[in-house]
Amino acid sequence: HDIFKYVCDDIRPSERSIQRYRREYGNYFEVLLQMTLKKAFDEGFTEFNHVAIDGTIKKAYNSNNNTITKKETQILVDYYEGRPIDPESLEKLHKPAQRLLEKKDMDDEDKLELLYGIETQFTFTGQDRIPVNDIEARFMKGKKGNYMVAYNIQSAVDYDTKLICAINVTQNPTDHYELPNIAERAIRNINTKPKYISADTIYLNQISLSYLADKKIDGLIPNRKQSKEKIGKLNPNPYHKDHFEYDYELDAFKCPEGNYLHFFAKYIEPHKDPEKPDKIKRLYNNYEACKHCPARNKCCSSPQTHKTITEYGSEMQKAMNQKMEKQEYKDEYAKRSSVEGPFGIFKEQFQIEKEVVIGMVKTEERINLDALAYNLIRLYNIKQEIENTTEDLEDFCES
């Protein structure tokens, strides 16, 4: 690239120099990302009205087999702390633990420090195995159903410009409760609150909704049925819950035969994680209607005498469900499909899966560098598109 050659006096830096640059200046990449967003705002390219939240996973620099158990960790800690160890227990260690034991380019103090770090991760996560090469990475489920040692990459993207507004790397294996953190980061980077924040169904929970309400941001998060309906994947069984229509005024479900199942009970289901809000379960049925319904055998399984609909969610979730039934919000939410491109570019052109980075902080710094490069290219392209459009318009008027 001509600019690169000019700045570097036509000298290509070594890979070691590039790695050192990334290591020493990593904490500045997000600041530079903020500058690209400010430039877009100052140029009038966007006002950040609609920011879309999404998540993906990035494979860590650690194979699935290169992990160590809690028992093996304790054996090695005892060994390096000088406690008596049965030689047979050392011989029975699995290969990753054996490799650590036999590692020649690492002194005992460094090995012990690594093992202490692994012990901390066991306490912090509750997992039964910890990756040895990247102890902060976690086993996560990929889109193909396979598990891999990875990081959860959360992103926020502006609809108008497709610029990346924020990146947040986490250890959580799912996206459920990630919206507040990535949204807060995006607001800090764009220096304003967007009118809309959209997200997939997996983000629909009390924590996300409370955050959006507190920030007075118009959230756009469909429920599972609305998402399935949008892509035409409702359950083919005509008597499945997907085909029971909820009446918000009556607080009742209308069944395919035209009868209403009314609310009759609410239960609080404690969350497994005490720091997360309890789940609210609402039950609906109509025993008399089901008793005399000619379609009961098609709708209910053989032991059932009547149909019961179970619905999860608070009043805030009901309000979100009702809002997402309105066409104006469906149209606004439909825009998010066009902002899912950056990570496709990351994986195909930037080859982020091949990047050798270890640790959560360093992974986030590297993804921020990728996001910075993406935003700079995107800004250039936006400016070129505007200039070309202006030239075409001038040529048309002159002709």
Where are these regions (language model features)?
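Anion-binding and metal-coordination hotspots
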Residues: 6-399
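A detector of single, family-specific signature residues
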Residues: 2
